[in-house]
Amino acid sequence: VMKDPDGGVASLKGETINLVELSVSHYLLARALEEQGLSERDVNIVNTSDDDIVAAVSSDDVRNIVTWNPLLTEAAATPGAEIVFDSSQIPGHIKDLTLVNTETLKDNPKLGKALTGAWYEVMAILESNTQKGEDARAFLGQASGTDQKGYEDQLAGMKMFWEPDTAVAFANSDEAFQAMDDVRQFSFKHGLLGEGAPSADFI
């Protein structure tokens, strides 16, 4: 989000940007800058908690922020503020996942089946136009700091794998491979793979 943007992401060179450091917001910024031939070295990053990010963009001192929903919706409503780049422009890079260690899964194959079954049982409820579905969306909206409508607006703006076959197709795609490679490279560069990681190939 930029206030009174003139030139979009390309104009961020030398600018200060507030975000939660080493988060998906940080990663999104890195990808946005890269697309414009820039890097993190070209900007000044100020680590700002998600509790403070909306108040920050409302102040006169802050012109540029990166954040996630539902905070994004609130921040973008600031007079003069405009979304100049979002995760839809790098599809497949920012995902919400449930992961299980490979060896653990090999040793406990029933665990994978149980988790997957539970996941898609919840997905079916979440997608449904039933009272159960409405209750689930209202609960998750409140849990994520918004309400049912706010949560449903978020769902409408996300690519959801409602069916298992679409998730499998994506996981096996070149797009997913490239996205995960970019994520691990970023993670290694910023020390997120741990002190003992010798290279990005650690993951």
Language model: regions and residue ranges:
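Pocket-lining segment of extracytoplasmic ligand-binding domains
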Residues: D51-D147
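Residue-level detector of family-conserved "landmark" positions at structurally sensitive sites
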Residues: L22, V43, D86, G150-Y151, ...
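Intrinsically disordered, low-complexity polar segments
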Residues: G191-I203
